[in-house]
From Swiss-Prot:
Residues 1-27 form the signal peptide. This is CD166 antigen. Strongest expression in the lung, then brain, liver, and kidney. Present in the somatosensory system, basal ganglia, cortex, olfactory system, and circumventricular organs. Homodimer. Interacts (via extracellular domain) with CD6 (via extracellular domain). Homodimerization and interaction with CD6 involve the same region and cannot occur simultaneously. The affinity for CD6 is much higher than the affinity for self-association. Interacts (via glycosylated extracellular domain) with LGALS1 and LGALS3. Interaction with LGALS1 or LGALS3 inhibits interaction with CD6. Glycans are attached at N95, N167, N265, N306, N361, N457, N480, N499. The lineage of its organism: Eukaryota, Metazoa, Chordata, Craniata, Vertebrata. SUPFAM superfamilies: Immunoglobulin. Residues 562-583 are annotated as: Disordered. One of its GO terms (molecular function) is identical protein binding.
Length: 583
């Protein structure tokens, strides 16, 4: 016969059965929390009228419970179980909401809220999920450079402290990189910190670059799950130096090759379009089969015209990859014959030649006493006015600074030549006597009166121009006198005399010499007259030819008319004879 148990035993038994079996119908409830935040878990149960107390527990992986918090409905007191990982982290409110501060990865568990009455136990499970945003990904262990046609490690993309773990993606210019055999290789790995349970993700990229990757940005991203869903964080851009071989060689000349002249320094610069550019080249000079090894520049100093020719440079290890250029060293030679100081006698012949030798057509300018001449000088018979400083100057317009000049200082000497003239003043009270002197060096003039032999100092002289000048005196002689003019220079002493009648005796005046300026005017007038006469003669000749052609044509026409008239007369006579015969 079975005995009946006590009421307390019966209650404990019912509670155990309820805790183990009775799980009223609330479904799973999930609370998402960020790492380090406070986890708040409502009980989600209606508080019954006869509530004795409330408890929170979590379940171990094997299903065994661990109680962590207790609150009595009557004493309003809270008790926390001695669980080391939750010490000083728990808070249980009056409505049995459990809060856990400083959320950790280890808090990812199934927590259960239990409300206990005298005859029942009510439970509401809550699943806690903890998320940790990973650090911003960064590209580390970057390659110093990438080489074309070589599969080489570009770098590692690393993102730390993530929970749960995330995925890393590589991008080239914003487009996703996918593994391609021999061209793109991606190796992903993740590690978990035993203490924090946080993940570190690393993705290594090996990449075969091309020249199209120059200045192309590479990035990576990490995609992870957070409390609000999936998110992505991008790294900073990384741009890599792309190494590629030289495909073309160019050669430059400094200064520009169209302006090189003798005496200049020439620098040849050879460039390759590879990266990095070649540092050394072979330079080949005109007429030299062997090259000269140098850096990317080679300098020739004080070049001469024989440096004109073809210059070439090439890569050290690829002689067929070369470039060439033609250099012309411009030159300009000038030879003036005669040059320097030349002394000639008046009337002499002096041929002058200015010979130019240049790398291209040069301009030639003649100057006399700083005045430009229209043509080069030529002296078939030297005059005093031909004396002066002559300069032959030549230049190459295309080449700055290339000009030459030579000078000729021409001295025309002559013995003194004298001509004396006299002229009576219209008033008849005085006479002007002029001594015209020509010669070089400038002759000195002296006047004397025959008889007395006295020297006359009261004279007036003209300027000495082109080897000529004159000296004049004005006298009023009471009797006939003879005036003597003496001209002397380093070459000779010349004397001339002139008889002058007394003022009371009329005499014929002698005309003055024509000055150089007047002589030129006379020559110009003579040329003009000759031109007019020649023009008139040509006009008369043309008129004569036209008249002759006209007369010839007129005579021909007259013959034709007379012939026609004769034929008409003959026809008339024939008609008359015919009439007579019929009668």
């Amino acid at each position: 016969m079975a005995s009946k148990g006590s009421p307390s035993c019966r209650l404990v038994f019912c509670l155990l059965i309820s805790a183990a079996v009775l799980r009223p119908g609330l479904g799973w409830y999930t609370v998402n929390s960020a790492y380090g935040d406070t986890i708040v878990m409502p009980c989600r149960l209606d508080v019954p009228q006869n509530l004795m107390f409330g408890k929170w527990k979590y379940e171990k992986p094997d299903g065994s419970p661990v109680f962590i918090a207790f609150r009595s409905s009557t004493k309003k007191s809270v008790q926390y179980d001695d669980v080391p990982e939750y010490k000083d982290r728990l808070s249980l409110s009056e409505n049995y909401t459990l809060s856990i501060n400083n959320a950790k990865i280890s808090d990812e568990k199934r927590f259960v809220c239990m409300l206990v009455t005298e005859d029942n136990v009510f439970e509401a499970p809550t699943l806690v999920k903890v998320f940790k945003q990973p650090s911003k990904p960064e590209i580390v262990n970057r390659a110093a450079f990438l080489e074309t046609e070589q599969l080489k490690k570009l770098g590692d993309c690393i993102s730390r402290d993530s929970y749960p773990d995330g995925n890393i993606t590589w991008y080239r210019n914003g487009k996703v990189l996918q593994p391609v055999d021999g061209e793109v290789s991606i190796l992903f790995k993740k590690e978990i910190d035993p203490g924090t349970q946080l993940y570190t993700m690393t993705s290594s990229l090996e990449y075969k670059t091309t020249k199209s990757d120059i200045q192309m940005p590479f990035t990576c991203s990490v995609t992870y799950y957070g409390p609000s869903g999936q998110k992505t964080i991008y790294s900073e851009q990384a741009i890599f130096d792309i190494y590629y071989p030289t495909e073309q060689v160019t050669i430059q000349v400094l200064p520009p090759k169209n302006a090189i002249k003798e005496g200049d320094n020439i620098t040849l610069q050879c460039l390759g379009n590879g990266n990095p550019p070649p540092e050394e080249f072979m330079f080949y000079l005109p007429g030299q089969a062997e090259g000269i090894r140098s850096s990317n520049t080679y300098t020739l100093t004080d070049v001469r015209r024989n440096a004109t020719g073809d210059y070439k440079c090439s890569l050290i290890d690829q002689r067929n990859m070369a470039a060439s250029t033609t250099i012309t060293v411009h030159y300009l030679d000038l030879s003036l014959n005669p040059s320097g100081e030349v002394t000639k006698q008046i009337g002499d012949t002096l041929p002058v030649s200015c010979t130019i030798s240049a790398s291209r057509n040069a301009t030639v300018v003649w100057m006399k006493d700083n005045i430009r001449l229209r043509s080069s000088p030529s002296f078939s018979s030297l005059h005093y006015q031909d004396a002066g400083n002559y300069v032959c100057e030549t230049a190459l317009q295309e080449v700055e600074g290339l000009k030459k000049r030579e000078s000729l200082t021409l001295i025309v000497e002559g013995k003194p030549q004298i001509k004396m003239t006299k002229k009576t003043d219209p008033s008849g009270l005085s006479k002007t006597i002029i001594c015209h002197v020509e010669g070089f060096p400038k002759p000195a003039i002296q006047w004397t009166i025959t008889g007395s032999g006295s020297v006359i100092n009261q004279t007036e002289e003209s300027p000495y121009i082109n080897g000529r000048y004159y000296s004049k005196i004005i006298i009023s002689p009471e009797e006939n006198v003879t005036l003597t003019c003496t001209a002397e220079n380093q070459l000779e002493r010349t004397v001339n005399s002139l008889n002058v009648s007394a003022i009371s005796i009329p005499e014929h005046d002698e005309a003055d010499d024509i000055s150089d300026e007047n002589r030129e005017k006379v020559n110009d007038q003579a040329k003009l007259i000759v031109g007019i006469v020649v023009g008139l003669l040509l006009a008369a000749l043309v008129a004569g030819v036209v008249y002759w052609l006209y007369m010839k044509k007129s005579k021909t026409a007259s013959k034709h008319v007379n012939k026609d008239l004769g034929n008409m007369e003959e026809n008339k006579k024939l008609e008359e004879n015919n009439h007579k015969t019929e009668a």
